[in-house]
From Swiss-Prot:
Enzyme's top EC category: hydrolase
Cofactor binding, per record: Binds 2 Mg(2+) ion per subunit.
Full protein name: Crossover junction endodeoxyribonuclease RuvC
Active site: D8, E67, D139
Pfam families to which the protein is assigned, alphabetical: RuvC
SUPFAM superfamilies the record matches: Ribonuclease H-like
UniProt record similarity statement: Belongs to the RuvC family.
UniProtKB keywords: Cytoplasm, DNA damage, DNA recombination, DNA repair, DNA-binding, Endonuclease, Hydrolase, Magnesium, Metal-binding, Nuclease
């Protein structure tokens, strides 16, 4: 049994999703968004750190997975996204959680079956996979997708290596 916290980072909205993995079953635990104020970036980064630290205390996850930075046309946006990711990763490492990172293509492939899936397709599949009554908000669905991707990656590695331990994958020390 493992509780996985998935995070879709953003400097304005950071999505989070928590699933409990029991055997081959993925059970929805919770999800939502951390919406930062329109204050200066350092204050928003602290809000992300504090928000995720509280979520970690509330849900007590065993593993932490986050979406990797993508290349953006706007360098300033990419830098802010990288800083938001950093705040999220520090919250995880402060709680001694192993950190895994996945690209958007890996996440979409794990959830939908194609790395070129649209946001609406990810939302629909997350609703189906986790048996939710309605589709979650886009950022929360993306975060749940990160958690589902991590679960599938762990299952695949374990199948390949017997008792492979993916906790070392992407771990920050």
């Amino acid at each position: 049994m493992a509780i996985i916290l998935g995070v879709d980072p953003g400097s304005r909205i950071t999505g989070y999703g928590v699933i409990n993995c029991v055997g081959r079953q993925q059970i929805y635990v919770g999800s939502g968004c951390i919406r930062t104020s329109s204050d200066e970036l350092p204050i928003r980064l602290k809000q992300i750190f504090d928000g995720l630290s509280e979520i970690i205390r509330q849900y007590q996850p065993d593993e932490f997975a986050i979406e990797r930075v993508f290349m953006a046309k706007n360098a300033d946006s990419a830098l802010k996204l990288g800083q938001a990711r950093g705040a999220a990763i520090v919250a995880a490492t402060a709680a001694n959680l192993p950190v895994a990172e996945y690209s958007a293509t890996q996440i979409k492939s794990a959830v939908v079956g194609t790395g070129r899936a649209q946001k609406a397709q990810v939302q629909h599949m997350i609703q189906q996979l986790l048996k939710l009554p309605s589709a979650p908000q886009a950022d929360a669905a993306d975060a749940l997708g990160v958690a589902v991707c991590h679960y599938h990656t762990c299952q695949s590695l374990a199948a390949l290596g017997g008792r492979a331990n993916v906790r070392t994958y992407g771990r920050y020390k």
